[in-house]
Amino acid sequence: MDHIRNFSIIAHIDHGKSTLADRIIQVCGGLADREMEAQVLDSMDIERERGITIKAQTAALSYRARDGKVYNLNLIDTPGHVDFSYEVSRSLSACEGALLVVDASQGVEAQTVANCYTAIELGVEVVPVLNKIDLPAANPENAIEEIEDVIGIDATDATRCSAKTGLGVEDVLESLIAKVPPPKGDPAAPLQALIIDSWFDNYVGVVMLVRIVNGTLRPKEKIKMMATGAQYPVEHVGVFTPKSRNLESLSAGQVGFIIAGIKELTAAKVGDTVTHVAKAASEPLPGFKEVKPQVFAGLYPVEANQYDALRESLEKLKLNDASLQYEPEVSQALGFGFRCGFLGLLHMEIVQERLEREFDMDLITTAPTVVYEVVQSDGSTIMVENPAKMPEPGRIAEVREPIVTVNLYMPQDYVGSVITLCEQKRGSQINMQYHGRQVQLTYEIPMAEIVLDFFDRLKSVSRGYASMDYEFKEYRSSDVVKVDMLINGDKVDALSIIVHRSQSQYRGREVAAKMREIIPRQMYDVAIQAAIGAHIVARENIKALRKNVLAKCYGGDITRKKKLLEKQKEGKKRMKQVGSVEIPQEAFLAILRVEDK
């Protein structure tokens, strides 16, 4: 066991994490040169295109060090984005060490820090590495100062490398072997294995990626999950060298996979502990928690007959994404669809994109909302994740909205504009620190404000230099109201929004004005109204298209003209009673694009 090293790589988006992983695999000969491709461990197309890692992947590599010994290195690739922070903490708790990759030309950024603190809390040894030192803009001294200043770990002897050219990659492995301790654990103790990740394979069912903490596991033994108590016979165990390879057994300290003919992904929850049925461990490994969705949106098929296809696609996605939740929902305006829960905005975009790309779905998405805690006047508390389910104003005693703590990092030139943005979003400042040229701001902001367009606007006010990460803090009482949109007096449920009272009139007016531009003119007048309860806060009219019925009258008596106009008026009135207004797809997106003033 002294020759095993389990490590993962922590980095901000675009700091070269996946490229470094590729180089390490190449140096260790995990894949032949002809099988090498960029970003070996990012298996989904969408991961490659966006240049992000979503699912955790592993590679078991062997490396002959300069002291002549052969070491087994287990690389566990972690997602870097804030939405997947639970997956990151699971991946990290399976390691003894982490390479902290910092771009020498850009310095430390928000997600690096967030994941790095997670690593330090879990007691993982952090080894700093400066990447991209072949760039003309690289400034390693500055980067080292920032690492020491912001994160507070000694980085004077940080290894310098360039993952792109392969320069210094062996030095990285050497310092990894020197600084990271070998795994502890007893191969003879009762089995405890931590599930780092799980995914669905069409041929063998669920594949679980595990780190064996104690004990030994062989095929044909019976295992059980400690969170659910379900039992399964093991079919195969093995490791990935990115390609899978079956082994006779997995023992303490190793990272590998278990295939046990499990049909549902929900049975193999990330962070759960696997143990033997016969000789069970007395307690599970710490740190398991159920992941709760934070952001909800309605997904509807454009064609009503695609509903079943959408349900099947969601079921298939759920196989590979246990944190996705969905339930059927009916909307008068959009027909049948699903209310889906996501971990965050990026997660939502990815699910939508995968549905459109892998399953060829055409979707309408309603505005994303967060979960509100509503105390009703009879004292009961309900969770509301859909504006349509919000009770009438008279039945509500108090509404609490989720507040998140946001950490922002940016160069000091942009502090002013970022603070202005946070104030607009009803944020309250908690802390502000200067680290050299970088500034760290901490704000508490309602989650609902972040869901809409906070990230995009942060990038635009800081010219792309600011980075952020957020975590849920608490529910806090707030004065929020539901704004309904009425078209000719009928509520359109899919257009309801929940906003803070201070912005409700403005948002109602804006949405009404937007809809006036978007809804095509009808043969009769259409009134668009925004209402809070029974109180109308805004109104826009779409004038009717009309035919000039007087064109054929030439001269003649006024009563003749009056008669024709009256007849037209009657016809329009009749039409208005039977007609219904078609609402185009853009109207639903219009809500998203309303900016706060």
Swiss-Prot record:
Pfam families: EFG_C, GTP_EFTU, GTP_EFTU_D2, LepA_C. InterPro entries: EF-4, EFG_III/V, EFG_V-like, EFTu-like_2, G_TR_CS, LepA_C_sf, LepA_CTD, LepA_IV. Residues 2-184 form the tr-type G domain. Its EC number is 3.6.5.n1. The keyword Hydrolase applies. It is an enzyme of class 3 (hydrolase). GO terms for biological process: positive regulation of translation. It catalyses: GTP + H2O = GDP + phosphate + H(+). It is a peripheral membrane protein. Keywords: Cell inner membrane, Cell membrane, GTP-binding, Hydrolase, Membrane, Nucleotide-binding, Protein biosynthesis. It is found in: Cell inner membrane. PROSITE patterns: G_TR_1, G_TR_2. GO terms for molecular function: GTP binding; GTPase activity; guanosine tetraphosphate binding; ribosome binding; translation elongation factor activity. GTP binds at D14, H15, G16, K17, S18, T19, N131, K132, I133, D134. One of its GO terms (cellular component) is plasma membrane. NCBIfam families: lepA, small_GTP. Required for accurate and efficient protein synthesis under certain stress conditions. May act as a fidelity factor of the translation reaction, by catalyzing a one-codon backward translocation of tRNAs on improperly translocated ribosomes. Back-translocation proceeds from a post-translocation (POST) complex to a pre-translocation (PRE) complex, thus giving elongation factor G a second chance to translocate the tRNAs correctly. Binds to ribosomes in a GTP-dependent manner. Belongs to the TRAFAC class translation factor GTPase superfamily. Classic translation factor GTPase family. LepA subfamily. This is Elongation factor 4.
